[in-house]
Regions:
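Conserved beta-strand scaffold positions in the cores of enzyme catalytic domains, especially
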Residues: 29, 97-99, 156-158
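A glycine- and small-aliphatic-rich helix-loop capping segment at beta-alpha/alpha-beta transitions
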Residues: 24, 28, 71-75, 142-146
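Short catalytic helix/loop segments, enriched in acidic residues and glycine
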Residues: 24-39
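Conserved N-terminal catalytic core of the sugar/cofactor nucleotidyltransferase
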Residues: 2-9, 17, 35-126, 133-138
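A generic "binding-loop/recognition-motif" signal
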Residues: 14, 25, 60
Length: 165
């Protein structure tokens, strides 16, 4: 059976439309209620059965790496008392997260090209770092529905969603 096992999430943009807050925090870490967008995107990938994620980050986005770092002594102490930290540990057990730096912003095509070694000739899902689809925990929504199509007929699919203004 054909399954998508990898996802690429480019988040290397500068977030200029969200200035001044994005001077200090990456756009993908901006919260929706109490959870950053990047966490929702990884949860969506896990619900779709994806096991590996590559997050493409820009030169000043170490905060994205730090968000998912559960190894520091400080985080270890926090995880004893706060379920939220334990949840990130659990998420990391469900999907292997790796990172690559896009040193110069040359657009989406260049960002995806940085995933060449990660993809290693496998087909993969691409979730844009600012393309949030609320799924209510349904695995057949968003990227999950595209993965289901792929399982039945391995081809290339594009998901779109109307954004009312």
């Amino acid at each position: 059976m054909n399954k998508i096992k990898k996802v690429v999430i480019p988040v290397a943009g500068k977030g200029t439309r969200f200035l001044p807050i994005t001077k200090t925090i990456s756009k993908t870490l901006l919260p929706i209620v109490d959870t950053p967008v990047i966490q929702y995107l990884l949860e969506e990938a896990v619900q779709a059965g994806i096991k590996e994620a590559l997050i493409i980050i820009g030169y000043s986005q170490n905060d994205v790496i730090n968000y998912f770092n559960t190894e520091s002594t400080y985080v270890q102490k926090l995880s004893k008392d706060y379920e939220e930290i334990k949840y990130i540990k659990k998420l990391k057990q469900q999907i292997r997260i790796s990172y690559v730096f896009q040193e110069e912003a040359k657009g989406l095509g260049d960002a995806v090209y940085h995933a060449k070694a990660f993809a290693d000739k496998d087909d993969f899902a691409l979730i844009l770092g600012d393309d949030f689809v609320f799924s209510n925990g349904l695995s057949t929504y968003g990227i999950g529905s595209l993965c289901k199509f792929y399982e039945k007929n391995p081809n290339y699919y594009l998901g779109v969603q109307e954004v009312p203004y």
